[in-house]
Amino acid sequence: MADEKFSNFLTDIIDADLAEGKVDVVHTRFPPEPNGYLHIGSAKAIFINYTIAKHYGGLFNLRFDDTNPAREGDEYVQSILQDLKWLSAEPNGGIFYGSDYFERCYAYAEQLIKEGKAYVDDLTREEMQEYRGNDAGKPSRPSPYRDRTPEENLDLFRRMRAGEFADGEKTLRAKIDLASPNMNMRDPTIYRIKHVEHHRQGDKWCIYPMYDFAHPIQDAIEGITFSLCSLEFENHRPLYEWVITNLFGKEFPKQREFARLNVTNTVMSKRYLRELVEKNIVDGWDDPRMPTLSGLRRRGYTPTSIFTFVKEAGISQADNLVDMRQQEAVLRAELELNAQRRVAVLEPVKLIIDNYPADQCEYFDLPNNPNRDANDTTTRKVAFTKELWIENSDFFEVPPPKFKRLTLGSEVRLMGAYLVRCTGVDKDENGKVVAIHAEADLETRNGNPADGRKVRGTIHWVSCAHCLDAEVELYDKLFTEANMNSIPDDADFKDYLNPDSVKVLQGAKLEESLKDAKPGDRFQFVRNGYFTPDSKHEGVYNRIVTLKDSFKL
């Protein structure tokens, strides 16, 4: 039985089949086409298939659906393998390639031809659409080639394989039901001609099986019991079952569908994502603004937060739109516990402590992670000198109402160090403040003033002599429209790109303990958010997520 913590309509179906003895082993699969990078929507399919197999002590396969050679390639195969490894979704049932079944798919196609259940058609794509009618009431009519004899069809199909015909000149269609209200059952194409080299098979083949034909065959060969896929394939289920019944004569594999994961301000279409990459609108498939798993990984997302988000978004049969802020909130909750604290000044201005010795340097112990565990008292040493960097936004000559940080004559605490009072500023020829002067109360090291006076604000700082220079990239949503699935059909999705999806800050100042930080490390930059070193560009930090948001889990 399914774990109560992972119970949904899919586990109800599986529980019933197990109880009736219809299956002994729960065997699932994740079948990505290697023509693009996996995204957050793919993570839902991985999570469902992997977790269901794991909960029932079953098997989980990874199968590359490489039956359409036009855009497929090894680059995508390797990225998919990396993504599953990152997610710790181990395919304990094995790793397979749909192209390894080409010979068997071909043999099954010949079987259907011999049984009078498939025929070679000469109609063009446009003519076929006309003949098939539509689901709005236009009836279909049979192709003039529908009644070819099995012998003639077999000869033509073998000549298709031999390369005698051009792309689109002929197709192999299943002979099912032209009167069906389901368009997928009106003699669907199951083989087409494509004189395109395959990334694994080379030029061995010039005919390729359609997904709806190859997929159920592959499932049956691998012993899949539950073929779990997204809701767009619901109308394809009768064809899936037709293939299984006519070629294998059994009930299983069983296809069932779940709703896709849609996230606000995001597109999931590979076509759209590819266009963003190919037109250099983004910095590759792993741009931190992209919804791809490689982009989320580069952004700093954790694999555990991805699966937690997918689980909390729910598994149902009804499409819904999940707020991106829920995805961020899940990650933020994890990072709040696990990310080490560090100090970084993103938009620096110099603070000079006039009464502090120029040749002196002392070290303050700052906590690494005060929120992780009450017993976690680990600290690191941070250098303090006469000249410091503070945030430009932490000082105002003429402060706005309720401003609690540094102004002329006011006093603040330098986090973990001294109280300082602003005494003046230096300006350039344009009147811009280039340095702030202050005096420290040197009796307040790590403590409160003896006279008990209250200080309203605390600001962070980095020593000018002991810091690292960095570029910081602050990310926002990639699209301005919340529901990108609702834009008009004739609209250009690129018109909805957010012009402010990234803000680049040059010259940020980081505490020197970050010199050994590497991609994959995650830090809370105190008061500024969560950040990680970029995996492509040295000296660049990506903001993973902000410190706070109004969204509540």
Residue ranges and their predicted role:
Residues F309-D319, M324-L553:
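Substrate/cofactor-recognition hotspot
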Residues F6-D15, A19-L81, E197-S230:
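N-terminal catalytic cores of NTP/NDP-binding nucleotidyl/phosphoryl-transfer enzymes
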Residues P253-V330, E334:
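Long, charged, mostly alpha-helical binding arms that flank functional sites
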Residues D66-N68, D74, Q111-L273, L331, ...:
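Active-site cores that bind ATP or allylic diphosphates and position pyrophosphate for catalysis
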Residues V23, A118, A166, M183, ...:
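Intrinsically disordered or highly flexible coil/loop and linker segments, enriched in small
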Residues A19-K22, T51-L59, K85-N92, A220, ...:
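Secondary-structure transition/capping motifs at alpha-helix termini
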Residues P31-N35, R63-R71, G94-E103, E126-E127, ...:
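Conserved short loop/turn motifs at secondary-structure junctions
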Residues Y76-E103, Y108-A109, G116-Y119:
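A glycine-rich helix N-cap at a beta->alpha junction
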